[in-house]
Amino acid sequence: MQSSVNEFLTPRHIDVQVVSPTRAKITLEPLERGFGHTLGNALRRILLSSMPGCAVVEAEIDGVLHEYSAIEGVQEDVIEILLNLKGLAIKLHGRDEVTLTLSKKGSGVVTAADIQLDHDVEIVNPDHVIANLASNGALNMKLVVARGRGYEPADSRQSDEDESRSIGRLQLDSSFSPVRRIAYVVENARVEQRTNLDKLVIDLETNGTLDPEEAIRRAATILQQQLAAFVDLKGDSEPVVVEQEDEIDPILLRPVDDLELTVRSANCLKAENIYYIGDLIQRTEVELLKTPNLGKKSLTEIKDVLASRGLSLGMRLDNWPPASLKKDDKATA
């Protein structure tokens, strides 16, 4: 197989093996020799450190002043309860922080299903055990759930407000990442007479709040955005004003008609002045459900179509709409 020294192979075979709802194996081949480790390690680091998610950041338990306490009638001590709270898989739809309550008494197991949820909060693992109560036991607590990224120790959230914080509000080290495990291996691949190529196999497991395939797409998008600066690398010999407009993904400038939604969904979006994909992804699920004639079926359709393009609802665009889009709108008018 003859090829130019400036031409590189790109994966022509992509296989996604769904092992379980929370685990998948993604295989890409062929890759030039060495690119398996280059891409695999970069994606692995992003998946572990940069995926946004939700976690319990603070807990307030009735009758507890500090984490080294014990609660009468509760099998676990407070430290064990806090560790169990870290295992909750929570999704927030439309909000960055929410306070939840849990109240249970009498003999039995306290699970995530006992937490009282708001309409825009979802717990993916309702069977997750938090504590075990005896007949005389009772557990009442408030949980603060926040959206974040990566790992955040409790002391990093300390501020001047700590002095005024009431005693008994326990801070938790929080792992926001929905990725529970990520591993990759590089195997040999062959294309015609070339036998020194790479095959990248990524084994990814999440906590259920994020689909494994979507996690890969988001990680690849982050990597692409970070590398974009190197593509148009320029020196600082002249002061250059960098317009945020240049960083906008071209797909966001396309009309929502390009998503090929059903007529009902498309008309509902236009009725809300949502004409571009960039307009759509900034809306939350809660906001869209308030749209007349747009139900959960249409919402699911919109989410699936966006996910197929590596996008999702509730994304933030600081520089939207871009100046060029405004000019086009004026010209059309």
From Swiss-Prot:
One Gene Ontology term of the molecular function aspect: protein dimerization activity
Stretches the record annotates as Alpha N-terminal domain (alpha-NTD): 1-234
Pfam families: RNA_pol_A_bac (PF01000), RNA_pol_A_CTD (PF03118), RNA_pol_L (PF01193)
SMART domains associated with the record: RPOLD (SM00662)
GO CC entries: cytoplasm; DNA-directed RNA polymerase complex
Chain segments carrying region Alpha C-terminal domain (alpha-CTD): 248-333
Entry keyword annotation includes Transferase: yes
Family membership: Belongs to the RNA polymerase alpha chain family.
Function: DNA-dependent RNA polymerase catalyzes the transcription of DNA into RNA using the four ribonucleoside triphosphates as substrates.
Complexes and interactors: Homodimer. The RNAP catalytic core consists of 2 alpha, 1 beta, 1 beta' and 1 omega subunit. When a sigma factor is associated with the core the holoenzyme is formed, which can initiate transcription.
Recorded domain comment: The N-terminal domain is essential for RNAP assembly and basal transcription, whereas the C-terminal domain is involved in interaction with transcriptional regulators and with upstream promoter elements.
NCBIfam families: PRK05182.1-2, PRK05182.2-5, rpoA
Protein name in UniProt: DNA-directed RNA polymerase subunit alpha
Species whose genome carries this gene: Pseudomonas putida (Arthrobacter siderocapsulatus)
